[in-house]
Amino acid sequence: MRIIPRTMSTQHPDNAKVPEWAKSEVIEGEDEVKEAFLAYSMYGVHEVMWDAEGKDVDTHVVRKLLSNYPDYFREHILGKDVFLTYRLPNPKVEGADRKVFAETMESIPITYDLAEKFYGNGITVPVFEVILPMTTSNLEIISVARYYEKAVANEDELELYDGVKVKDLVGEIYPKVIEVIPLVEERDSLQNIDNIVEGYYKVIKPKYMRVFLARSDPAMNYGMITAVLSVKIALSELYKLSESLNFEIYPIIGVGSLPFRGHLSPENYEKVLEEYKGVYTYTIQSAFKYDYDYDKVKSAISSINNSRIGPAKILEKYEEDVLRKITILYTERYQPIIESLANAINDVSVLLPRRRARKLHIGLFGYSRSAGKVSLPRAISFVGSLYSIGIPPELIGISSLSNLDEKEWDIFKQNYVNFKHDLQTAARFFNWESFELIKDIWKISEDTIAKIKEDIDYAESVIGIKLGGIDYDSRKHILMSSLFLLSFKEKILQESKKYLYEMALIRRSLG
């Protein structure tokens, strides 16, 4: 059995600080290859996700890793000891990137040939897994697996002319199959994930399966509580399915540093391990790696790598029904407020520092079936914008919990163990002065302000959260938030950008 990675380094551009080795503030090109090597060698991460979604991808990464760092990769075999996993564009959703999908798939046999030359015949398959984002059905991942088998691996048998086959020209193509990891991001897809996985299992018959649960995009689209509970439902469903099919499923969770995006940081990783029992692989995003002291980062990654994997909590039907009900109530409260704040979010997001060479890319919210009225930036910029205007998104929609009876509240608390801790961490950055300023700058309606105030009041009076600055850093952040809004109002944008950067440094994450 292969090693299942416990940590996966990603290229999410959520870091406030720029790492010392980067040639510029925007990490791109050769720097991303170096970053992949450092993730393995310096930080001890088991796996690197190589992202072809929403950016120009370097499909020669394996060649560069093996040729630039031969000593390391002779000792640590790529595909056996450490892993490189491609994140594809979803051709069903990202029409402009369909050919990037094809190009990335076509590069997999090249990596095989390179590894054969480097390691010797049959030693390793360096890239054998791909991640498909925004997966909503089993047909999508079945199509990806079959596309590779039929359109890539089997093309060596095509006859060109007069008995001459493709393999006579370019050699045989390996590997013959790849493993597809669905990245599930929509609320309904997360809550019905068993249908996606079981359908794929019946057709493809894999020996095991890795399933990637998004935690960040669902929070942006449906609210933080909906995202957490949807992941809990998904974990329960996956473990039940694993038992019934007698088939190993290894969940991955995509988590960032701030509470809204998962709260996995070098200072909070133990609580995240406690919260998401049953998860095998945790994403180590850029803020985790670059916004904290190196020794603390390396120690945290080592602890995650060596932590015990507890079984996921299996939900009874009545518990699952309650959690589903909460996600609906919460989202109904959360989404209209976000729609009203969309102009503010979009205006602020374009001023945040850029950390990756990514193409412009709207988030799922822009074409979400449940709230298709507005387009928003990607989750990192979304979160950074709301923190910067002094309204952490973790607080939005909270008062919907007032609809729960005592039994429902108990079920909620049992299934979101660190709810109060996450909320308190975010609430330190709430700025009371924001209301008047955002009303003045973006003409935010009294109704929206009143709804946010209800959420704030509920967090304070019912949950017992202390709002606003409670230490030097949070008070400084609140002051910077007011200064940012004032400078933005006066169109002094260079100062606005400076305050945004300073706040990100305090949070230890852009968003």
From Swiss-Prot:
Its EC number is 4.1.1.31. The keyword NAD does not apply. It is an enzyme of class 4 (lyase). It catalyses: oxaloacetate + phosphate = phosphoenolpyruvate + hydrogencarbonate. It comes from the Archaea. The keyword 4Fe-4S does not apply. Keywords: Carbon dioxide fixation, Lyase, Magnesium. Its cofactor is Mg(2+). One of its GO terms (molecular function) is magnesium ion binding. GO terms for biological process: carbon fixation; oxaloacetate metabolic process; tricarboxylic acid cycle. Belongs to the PEPCase type 2 family. Homotetramer. Catalyzes the irreversible beta-carboxylation of phosphoenolpyruvate (PEP) to form oxaloacetate (OAA), a four-carbon dicarboxylic acid source for the tricarboxylic acid cycle. This is Phosphoenolpyruvate carboxylase. The gene is ppcA.
